[in-house]
Amino acid sequence: MTQPDMSQILAQAQQMQAQLQAAQQEILATTVVGNAGNGLVTVTMAGNGEVSAVTVDPKVVDPEDVETLQDLLLGAFKDAHNKVANVAEEKMGPLSQGMGGLF
């Protein structure tokens, strides 16, 4: 078995690093909207997990039933968080599979 060429390994590593940085930038530039209650509550989240907006339809604001609103807010946040995770997996997944070929 022949030893891999170090310059080739270094070039592959540099290419992977550039692809990783590009994927990270794409993730950071992504904005997703999570929702709950068929859109009655929405959470807008950036790729870094920062929440930039929360909207609540006045129909769900009931002082007698705060728990439902809390559940909807939590559901919308989780939905947005899952969408960010899916975007990250979509962008980073192919790169992690390619790392096996480095060594």
UniProtKB/Swiss-Prot annotation:
The keyword Transit peptide does not apply. It comes from the Bacteria. Its main location: cytoplasm. The keyword Cytoplasm applies. It is found in: Cytoplasm, Nucleoid. Keywords: Cytoplasm, DNA-binding. InterPro entries: YbaB-like_sf, YbaB/EbfC. GO terms for molecular function: DNA binding. Pfam families: YbaB_DNA_bd. Homodimer. Binds to DNA and alters its conformation. May be involved in regulation of gene expression, nucleoid organization and DNA protection. NCBIfam families: DNA_YbaB_EbfC. Belongs to the YbaB/EbfC family. This is Nucleoid-associated protein Cgl0243/cg0297.
